[in-house]
Amino acid sequence: MLILLEGADGSGKTTLCKQLKEFGFNVEPTVSRSETNQYEQWIKLINKGDAIIDRSFITDLVYRSVDDKKAGNITLEQMCYLLKYCKIILCDTDSAFEDSMKRGENNIVDKETATKIKDAYKLILTMLEKFTKAEVFTYNWKKQKFNEVIKFII
């Protein structure tokens, strides 16, 4: 099973990834968007066994829905297949944009874009839950305990 960590910049994905690694979970690097065949790379990760992944093909779908650029090379059919072997944790805080700015990150340039990304995540993950039966857990590290994440994974 792959555990996909998703969420806007500043939402706590990388911190959660580090905590899960310290807890003993296998953490794998995400598949590069520059890969010519991302689907094959995801299949290799699934075949490798349980792992935590910081961002996934869902990230590409969300960000492309906001900036109107072409999405990656994974088809909807392939995505539905991959999701059978994944659980998704959406890291979500009300202050993600501000937290990102405090750290000096500049991937998201304004609050309006950050809000669009947050809304796109919620919409896309709701649709994936409904139509593919994907398991999604929303985690706000400022309000919830780490053990809630562990319970979802296990």
Model-derived features: where do they sit?
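Walker A (P-loop) ATP-phosphate-binding motif of ABC ATPase nucleotide-binding domains
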Residues: 2
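Hydrophobic anchor at the beta1->P-loop junction of P-loop NTPases
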Residues: 5
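Short, solvent-exposed loop/turn segments at secondary-structure junctions
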Residues: 8-11, 56-59, 94-97, 142-144
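Conserved substrate/cofactor phosphate-moiety recognition/catalytic segment
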Residues: 8-11, 15-52, 59-67
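Flexible, charged surface loops at secondary-structure boundaries
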Residues: 44-50, 81-84, 132
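Structural recognition of the conserved hydrophobic beta-strand(s) that form the central parallel beta-sheet
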Residues: 51-54, 91
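A glycine- and Lys/Arg-enriched "phosphate-lid" helix/loop adjacent to the NTP-binding pocket
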Residues: 67-128
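Phosphate-binding beta-loop-alpha motif at adenosine-nucleotide cofactor sites
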Residues: 91-93, 108-112, 130-149
